[in-house]
Amino acid sequence: MKRIAAELGVSVTTVSKVLNHHADIGPATRARVLARVEELGYRPNAVARSLTLRRTHTLGVIIPDLMHSFFVEVVAGLEAIVSARGYGLLLCASGEDPKKERVALDMLRARQVDGMVLASATATSNTALLRDIAAQGTALVMIDRDDHPRVRCHRVLTDDVKVGRLATAHLVAAGRRAIAHIKGPPIAHSRRREQGYRDALAAARLRVREDRLVEGGFMEADGYRAMQALISLTPRVDGVFAVNDPAAVGAMKAIWDAGLRVPDDVSVVGAGDVAYSDLIRVPLTTVRWSKRDLGGRAAELILDQMDAGTTDRPRRVIIPPELIVRESA
């Protein structure tokens, strides 16, 4: 850095700020420094830099599934923002397993990442660990799932009650009256989507039959099993709101395997608008919210927190949902 500074007639501090993506350097100076850095093939020593700055310029991200298209889009939105500020991502998958989540949290803490973004595993028991991480000053943002209410951190979510209301109200508007709900695991956003389902039925003056609420899960196989149970009810259900799109797709397969038609016999609505929702035999009506915005807003919050060095006022950012009408309902 001293050589570059001397050649360009700027201070070593200026060169350092350019390399560390500080915003208080003018564009002309930044361009000159970066051009000379490129000419010299200069690469900062990451270990030395982290020791000097007390930052690793790495963020840890824990999501339930690295292959799930929903979370792929969330991470893409996150990465687009943080990479522009010189941060890299260290990705971990919990597999919806609290033990794996704990191992990932401990590993990220040992790696001294500057911050963590977490979509919590179902049935997680890691509240105490997360409170400890936040209390030690590691920037923490929770996305998509609103669990661990006692953990002081920013959160980026959708309005899950509205998700349930939009989906169920659409089934009511389509003339369906025996409307079932395939529930998710017992975590906050599943419960809120169920509440939206109940609210929409109440608004339509339709009675909630508890046998039409079947606990499923977030995967296709969960939706398939739940729908098999619902098909056996009398009178037969004529509409289904599934907690997410994979569960809805599984439900549709169970309907077809029973010799019934979607939407003629049973209408189906999902939630999440995953990548293949409009590519299946009967394109899926669903409720959508921007996954890239979810990741992007999480990135902005965690960068702001790291710059400020505190979370005096934890924020809840809500990404609004919207109904996407296709052919399944």
Model-found features: residue ranges?
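Bacterial carbohydrate/catabolite-sensing allosteric modules
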Residues: 39, 80-85, 109, 134-329
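Amphipathic helical "hinge" segments at domain boundaries
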Residues: 27, 31, 40-118, 181, ...
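Short beta->alpha connector loops
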Residues: 95-98, 121-124, 246
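N-terminal helix-turn-helix DNA-binding module of bacterial transcription factors
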Residues: 1-57, 329
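Residues at alpha-helix caps and immediate loop-helix transition turns in enzyme cores, especially N-
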Residues: 29, 70-74, 101, 129, ...
